[in-house]
């Protein structure tokens, strides 16, 4: 399957607008879940730092999620609950993407590397993995998931 997504989401779409971000440093979904949970405990809330505030924030807040790319594939998502503008000690603006701490594991979907975040249309998001939040498929190796998907079993 060719990599999906080029960062452009200008075409109309039914459903909410989403964001996608690289999970830098995470080796798998469980590692990402642990890192995000640790940061949630340290901070008292779940958020992701970014320099640029999304111009289409309202469309994302209408049910959108932050999709996480782990090792070249979208693998999980967190619902976006808000955006908060902040300033650092030097007066530079940045944005916090507020997220629900709960993870939803998705079926793998290839995605090219990029920096920062990108918009993702509802038509381009991967399906949630069977089993719901934290799905039973989260422990399955990528190659097995891809094979089951190619066979039409998931």
Predicted regions and their residues:
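Aromatic- and Lys/Arg-enriched surface recognition patch
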Residues: 79-126
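A generic structural signal for short beta-strands and their flanking turns/coil linkers
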Residues: 18, 62, 93-95
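Phosphate/adenylate-binding glycine loop and adjacent helical scaffold
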Residues: 3-11, 15, 19, 107-108
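Eukaryotic proteins' extreme N-terminal regulatory segments
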Residues: 13-42
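Short, well-structured hydrophobic secondary-structure segments
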Residues: 34-77
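Well-ordered alpha/beta subsegment
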Residues: 116-121, 126-154
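Short, intrinsically disordered, mixed-charge
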Residues: 37-38, 85, 150-153
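Generic structural "secondary-structure junction" signal
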Residues: 21-24, 63, 68, 76, ...
């Amino acid at each position: 399957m060719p990599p999906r997504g080029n960062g452009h989401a200008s075409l109309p779409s039914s459903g909410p607008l989403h964001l996608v971000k690289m999970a830098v440093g995470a080796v798998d979904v469980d590692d990402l879940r642990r890192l995000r949970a640790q940061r949630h405990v340290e901070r008292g809330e779940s958020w992701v730092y970014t320099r640029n505030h999304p111009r289409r924030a309202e469309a994302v807040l209408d049910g959108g999620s932050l999709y996480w790319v782990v090792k070249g594939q979208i693998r999980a998502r967190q619902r976006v609950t808000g955006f908060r503008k902040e300033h650092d000690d030097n007066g530079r603006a940045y944005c916090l993407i507020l997220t629900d701490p709960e993870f939803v594991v998705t079926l793998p979907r290839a995605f090219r590397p990029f920096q920062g975040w990108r918009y993702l249309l509802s038509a381009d998001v991967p399906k949630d993995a069977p089993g719901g939040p934290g799905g039973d498929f989260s422990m399955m190796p990528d190659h097995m998931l891809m094979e089951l998907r190619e066979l039409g079993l998931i």
